[in-house]
Curated annotation (Swiss-Prot):
The lineage of its organism: Eukaryota, Fungi, Dikarya, Ascomycota, Pezizomycotina. Coiled coil: none annotated. GO terms for cellular component: nucleoplasm. Belongs to the POA1 family. It catalyses: ADP-alpha-D-ribose 1''-phosphate + H2O = ADP-D-ribose + phosphate. Substrate binds at residues 15-17, 29-31, 36-41, 169-175. This is ADP-ribose 1''-phosphate phosphatase. Highly specific phosphatase involved in the metabolism of ADP-ribose 1''-phosphate (Appr1p) which is produced as a consequence of tRNA splicing. GO terms for biological process: DNA damage response; purine nucleoside metabolic process. Residues 1-200 form the Macro domain. SMART domains: A1pp. The gene is poa1. Keywords: Hydrolase, Protein phosphatase. It is an enzyme of class 3 (hydrolase).
Length: 200
């Protein structure tokens, strides 16, 4: 008999992601090109320009000085594929951006921004859905690891990550059915409030 898997507590609500409580971390999926040009990414860029500058710089550094990580041969329930590959960073990773003073002053709340790098490109160059799901598995695992490190290191920080809030990432312009990404989140063992727009 298989041991029970750790399931996270996913709560889905209708509303505005940006109304998350002070100190919350807002999770969304990103491309690796440094562009938040459409969809919810554009809303993030408009609301958190200082965080966008950090994201863009992170992408530009890795575009100009490529680095890779080796993804071992693994098969998940979700990806259905077995193959090893070299993944060009930041693809398959997470970037956790602490609240930026300029953004917090403009918005009245301190929000952490978590970028999950799930697609290499965007628009016509968006990665295929199965690649996005595999990258989501890697990025959520990386996010979970980084959050654990931040939690153990919080004694030396003024601010710690509060609640985790998320949009239905990958389901918009990346075109991956939400259920596939939700399954990855459920397997991560985290408590996340997922916000969908009113009527969405």
């Amino acid at each position: 008999m298989d041991p029970p898997s750790v399931r996270s507590k996913i709560t889905e609500i209708e509303g505005d992601l940006f109304h998350a409580p002070d100190g919350a971390a807002l999770i969304h999926a990103c491309n690796c090109q440094g562009s938040w040009g459409k969809g919810i990414a554009k809303a993030f860029k408009d609301k958190y320009p200082a965080a966008f500058a950090i994201y863009r710089s992170h992408c530009q550094n890795l575009l100009s000085s490529p680095r890779y990580m080796f993804e071992p041969d693994l098969q998940s329930e979700e990806s259905h594929a077995r193959s090893s590959r070299d993944v060009r960073l930041p693809e398959g990773t997470a970037l956790i951006i602490p609240p930026q003073k300029r953004d917090s002053e403009a918005n009245g709340k301190k929000h952490w921004i978590i970028c999950l790098f799930t697609s290499r490109g965007f628009g016509r160059a968006v990665s295929p859905p199965d690649v996005i799901v595999r990258n989501t598995e890697l990025a959520v695992a990386d996010m979970t690891r980084q959050l654990a490190e931040l939690q153990t290191d919080q004694s030396s920080r003024e601010e710690s990550v509060g609640e985790l809030w998320s949009c239905r990432f990958n389901a918009g312009l990346f075109g991956v059915p939400w259920e596939r990404s939700r399954r990855v989140l459920e397997d991560a063992g985290l408590e996340v409030t997922v916000v969908r727009p009113h009527g969405g």
